[in-house]
């Protein structure tokens, strides 16, 4: 059986019998599960009306929690640079040599994230937030790192930090 967050979520809904179908249909993360609708439940094989209602209600709660906690997450994609203060917005933009009329080249969905840069012979790649999250989680599991256990979750005493910072110039002179 699968042991992931979707299984735990379905277990909490008292519907663990659908876990394998969810994973087989690509719903292996809660971010993906937030997109579930009636056609998806048909494909997964959730036919009982009570089960469908329970899952759709849980999906609605996931979306609400995501909207409520939106300020708690980092944005992993680069932000577009702010518009420089200057000429009025009615000014005609100038083109650079080799640039099409539409402006700088865009990614496949019309956003600049699809662009890659090649400094020093290495190509930089941008990953979507969900894929990057999964890659990081898998790497932590492969390396045996548990962020919920010491030393990663150990509380740092503030008094010790403050004392160190107060004595820092003295300790650096002793070297």
Curated annotation (Swiss-Prot):
Entries under Pfam families matching the protein: SAM_1
Localization per Swiss-Prot or TrEMBL: Cytoplasm
Gene Ontology biological process terms in this record: regulation of intracellular signal transduction
Region (Disordered): 75-123
Listed SMART domains: SAM
Keyword Cytoplasm: yes
Entries under CDD domains matching the protein: SAM_Samd5
Compositional bias ranges of the Pro residues kind: 78-90
UniProt keywords, alphabetically: Cytoplasm
One GO term describing the cellular component: cytoplasm
Transmembrane regions: none
InterPro entries named in the record: SAM, SAM-SH3_domain_protein, SAM/pointed_sf
Domain SAM intervals: 1-65
Quaternary structure, from the entry: Interacts promiscuously (via SAM domain) with EPHA5, EPHA6, EPHA7, EPHA8, EPHB1, EPHB2, EPHB3 and EPHB4 (via SAM domain) (in vitro).
Protein name stated in the entry: Sterile alpha motif domain-containing protein 5
Species of provenance: Bos taurus (Bovine)
């Amino acid at each position: 059986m699968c042991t992931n967050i979707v299984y735990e979520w379905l277990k909490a809904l008292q519907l663990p019998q659908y876990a394998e179908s969810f994973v087989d249909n690509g719903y292996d993360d809660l971010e993906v599960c937030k997109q579930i609708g009636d056609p998806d439940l048909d494909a997964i094989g959730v036919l009982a009306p009570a089960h469908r209602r329970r899952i759709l209600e849980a999906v609605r709660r996931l979306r609400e929690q995501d909207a409520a906690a939106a300020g708690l997450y980092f944005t992993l994609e680069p932000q577009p640079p702010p518009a420089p203060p200057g000429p009025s917005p009615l000014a005609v933009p100038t083109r650079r040599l080799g640039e099409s009329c539409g402006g700088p080249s865009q990614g496949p969905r019309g956003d600049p994230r699809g662009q890659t840069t090649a400094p020093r012979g290495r190509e930089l790649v941008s990953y979507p937030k969900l894929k990057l999250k999964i890659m990081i989680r898998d790497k932590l599991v492969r390396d045996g790192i548990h962020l919920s256990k010491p030393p990663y979750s150990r509380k740092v005493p503030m008094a010790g930090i403050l004392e160190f910072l107060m004595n820092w110039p003295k300790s650096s002179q002793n070297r």
